């Protein structure tokens, strides 16, 4: 963040808040390269392109300075000389560098807001697990929840327009349009599953998508809080946004209705809660199903009117929390009653009272997880471990380290599961798959290989938390048993991994 502050202050004095000159600076691509190396994935570290080097960056910048290479051929865009043989590599480098540039205003705004609110350890708020304590606190008191699949954007210009309220640099926005229209097939961005959350896509597309989601969530939050303003900081930008929406076929008033106070009363619900991650969100309420249906059809109409996104009401499912479970962030969560018996005595009479309380139950999704392991060839579809043949050429230490890392990441992520038995089964599959892979490499049987190595191989699969607690407490102690049964939420999990994301 300090690097962003220094770089931007330098160019503010020279370029009048223009961001686009930064794309010609080498340190921008160095920042993008460092971010790529620091990505955390489950199976393998897929960082920035290994072919990237300082020489390639210098060559890329020199070609961008030559305007002839930046001209667009409308009739034959495949013959663009700018990319030439290294089209994919240069395209990746430009998009990641441009993403770093566009993120600068957002990063500076975040830093200033944290200083104003004096927020301590703000990185803890970024953890995925921080959502589940919110679930435990709020959801037992609610009755209905809607599973909302956010539709993918299909109109490029609307996405660019949503950025211009934060990036006040027309040249950067024009460069963004040029880059997206010329060097990317926009249809790949709106293809579900394989596009916007895939590893092959760039950080720039995620930034655009998050801006699109933030745009509609700002109005959703406005209706929820019944405030007198949107999230914008100036009324001039608010009027500019309204005029932009009025240029579209459907004006704003068709969504908000003519009587604005009546519209606010229409959505009045002090107990409604909203949670989102990636393309899925949950809207929960304590009110009746009638209000949930109002929100349902409002969202469908809003997406169609403002973003030209065709969304069907069937994409939003309304369920009763006490009877249905919901799948969110890899956990299968539900609300179940927790009945405790209390003995009360009044003078000489004693009686028993049932104290019923609702509790959030977070379960480990064993069947989808076995399906995910089967896709990457750790087991078959029935859950029987098999050898990972593609890893048989690696060294023994490398094979063991890969399996241990996968098992540790799964244990770390699913530490909040209410019942750990299913998690132990997955760890058993990984252990036996590791042994079979090593036995295959050494052309031996599993039984013979285990006799040769002994129990030390299986000890590698204990997580760091399990090792510490096993040293502090005996195996039979009640403290260790409560540790294995209890839920633990960690504040260092910043992304959801491939095996966890079963969709």
Swiss-Prot record:
Coiled coil: none annotated. One of its GO terms (cellular component) is chloroplast. Signal peptide: none annotated. This is Maturase K. One of its GO terms (molecular function) is RNA binding. It comes from the Eukaryota. Keywords: Chloroplast, mRNA processing, Plastid, RNA-binding, tRNA processing. It is found in: Plastid, Chloroplast. Belongs to the intron maturase 2 family. MatK subfamily. It comes from Rosa acicularis. One of its GO terms (biological process) is tRNA processing. Usually encoded in the trnK tRNA gene intron. Probably assists in splicing its own and other chloroplast group II introns.
């Amino acid at each position: 963040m300090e690097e962003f502050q220094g770089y931007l202050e330098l160019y503010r004095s020279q370029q009048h808040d223009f961001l686009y000159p930064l794309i010609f600076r080498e340190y921008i691509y160095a920042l993008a390269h460092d971010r790529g190396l620091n990505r955390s994935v489950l199976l393998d570290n897929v960082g920035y392109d290994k072919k990237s080097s300082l020489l390639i960056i210098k060559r890329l910048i020199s070609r961008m300075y030559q305007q002839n290479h930046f001209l667009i051929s409308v009739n034959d865009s495949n013959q663009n000389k700018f990319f030439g043989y290294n089209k994919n590599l240069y395209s990746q480098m430009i998009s990641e560098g441009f993403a770093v540039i566009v993120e600068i205003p957002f990063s500076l705004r975040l830093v200033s807001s944290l200083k104003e609110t004096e927020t301590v350890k703000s990185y803890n708020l970024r953890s995925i697990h921080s959502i589940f304590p919110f679930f435990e606190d709020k959801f037992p008191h609610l009755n209905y929840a809607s599973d909302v699949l956010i539709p993918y954007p299909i109109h490029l210009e609307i996405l660019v327009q949503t950025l211009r309220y934060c990036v006040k640099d027309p040249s950067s926005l024009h460069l963004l349009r040029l880059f997206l229209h010329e060097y990317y097939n926009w249809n790949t961005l709106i293809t579900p599953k394989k596009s916007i959350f895939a590893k092959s896509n760039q950080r720039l597309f995620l930034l655009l998508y998050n801006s699109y989601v933030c745009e509609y969530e700002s109005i959703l939050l406005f209706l929820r809080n019944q405030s007198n303003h949107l999230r914008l900081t100036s009324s001039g930008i608010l009027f500019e946004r309204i005029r932009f929406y009025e240029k579209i076929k459907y004006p704003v008033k068709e969504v908000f209705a003519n009587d604005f106070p009546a519209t606010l009363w229409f959505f009045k619900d002090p107990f409604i809660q909203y949670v989102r991650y990636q393309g899925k969100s949950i809207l929960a309420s304590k009110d009746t199903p009638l209000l949930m249906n109002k929100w349902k059809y409002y969202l469908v109409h809003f997406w169609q009117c403002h973003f030209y996104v065709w969304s069907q009401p069937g994409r939003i499912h309304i369920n009763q929390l006490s009877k249905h479970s919901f799948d969110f962030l890899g956990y299968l969560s539900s609300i179940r009653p927790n009945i405790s018996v209390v003995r009360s005595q009044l003078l000489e009479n004693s009686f028993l009272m049932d104290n019923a309380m609702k509790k959030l139950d977070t379960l480990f999704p064993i069947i989808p997880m076995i399906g995910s392991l089967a896709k990457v060839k750790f087991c078959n579809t029935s859950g029987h471990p098999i050898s990972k043949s593609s890893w048989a050429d690696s060294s023994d230490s490398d094979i063991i380290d890969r399996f241990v890392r996968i098992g540790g990441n799964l244990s770390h992520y699913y530490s909040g599961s209410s019942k750990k038995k299913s998690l132990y089964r997955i760890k058993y599959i990984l252990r036996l798959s590791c042994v079979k892979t090593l036995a295959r490499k050494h052309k031996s049987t599993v039984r013979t290989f285990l006799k040769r190595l002994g129990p030390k191989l299986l000890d590698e699969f204990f997580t760091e938390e399990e090792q510490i607690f096993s040293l502090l407490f005996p195996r039979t102690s009640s403290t260790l048993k409560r540790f294995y049964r209890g839920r633990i939420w960690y504040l260092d999990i910043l992304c959801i991994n491939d095996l966890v994301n079963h969709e």
